[in-house]
Amino acid sequence: MTDRWLVTGAAGMLGRDLVALLRGLNEPVVAITRHDLDITDRLSVRAVVDRHRPTTIVNCAAWTRFGEAEAGESAALLVNGGGARELAAVCRDRSIRLVHLSTDYVFDGTSRRPYAESAVTSPINAYGRTKQAGEQAVLDLLPDDGTIVRTAWLYGRHGMNFIRKMVRLEQLRETVDVVDDQWGQPTWTVDLAQQIVALVRHGASGVFHGTSAGEATWYDLARMTFRLLGADPGRVRPVPSDRIAGGELRPRYTVLGHDAWREAGLTPIRHWTTALTQAFPLLNADES
């Protein structure tokens, strides 16, 4: 049976690439933006689902504004926790597969090795707590048909991100200060979109980490961006997190392990440097 996809958050960086990929594969897909649907509204969620009758929903919708989540956690929780619960509930009632996007920030960052998919979550900030609530709702309501894909440090063509910010700052400043004590995995939205499609086609469920292989600091990522621009990476200066507003609330080490992909018979996402080298001409063209 052909999958019928419904993608929420379809105007976002990942959502746009996922919808474009599915259309390129001639897969039936409905792109839903926040203007089309409030995922916290139960009646609206069920009406949209019943109108389009998808077999798979990918929830890319989220409250991602980190600082605003700290200032108003209840509003972020309504979307990241409550919205996920509403989608999971309708998927349970209609026998629909749900892929829910989550974050590395569900972890506290105290580990010194990549977090396994089964590692205990312990967020240290409001954003992480609200995303943890969404994960739990999906796993509680859809133990067999729910899939959590945690991702991190996303970049892509559609919307502002760290790479595009560095491209602009290289043109505006002689030097750029970048945090060098937070570790993660830069991940191209195109790679993640391909991984989500492979996951659904394979019929796998559970928790997966949708991040690139390898690890880096923001400082490492900024230096590589400068190198790809043909600029001097020495213009990037390392600074500690406590020099950045809100830095104390961000976990230091949230590198994610990828064993679940291999156990499901799937290949994890490639190394972040390989992906960025391929993606960069596309990103830079948009800034020219």
Swiss-Prot record:
Keyword Repressor: no
Pfam families attached to this UniProt entry: RmlD_sub_bind
Protein name (Swiss-Prot/TrEMBL): dTDP-4-keto-6-deoxy-D-glucose reductase
Keyword Cell inner membrane belongs to the record: no
Site (Could provide a fine-tuning to achieve optimal pKa matching between active site and substrate): 103
Residue positions of the active site: 127 (proton donor/acceptor)
Residues that coordinate or bind NADH: 12-14, 38-39, 62-64, 127, 131
Gene Ontology MF term list: dTDP-4-dehydrorhamnose reductase activity; magnesium ion binding; oxidoreductase activity, acting on the CH-OH group of donors, NAD or NADP as acceptor
Pathway assignment: Antibiotic biosynthesis; novobiocin biosynthesis
Record text on cofactor binding: Binds 1 Mg(2+) ion per monomer.
EC number(s) on file: 1.1.1.-
A GO BP entry: novobiocin biosynthetic process
Keywords on record: Antibiotic biosynthesis, Magnesium, Metal-binding, NAD, NADP, Oxidoreductase
GO CC annotation: cytosol
List of residues binding NADPH: 13-14, 38-39, 62-64, 127, 131
Main EC class the enzyme belongs to: oxidoreductase
Family, as annotated: Belongs to the dTDP-4-dehydrorhamnose reductase family.
Entries under SUPFAM superfamilies matching the protein: NAD(P)-binding Rossmann-fold domains (SSF51735)
Required co-factors: Mg(2+)
Function statement: Reduces the product formed from the reaction of NovW with dTDP-4-keto-6-deoxy-D-glucose to result in dTDP-5-methyl-L-rhamnose in the novobiocin biosynthesis pathway, an aminocoumarin family antibiotic that targets bacterial DNA gyrases.
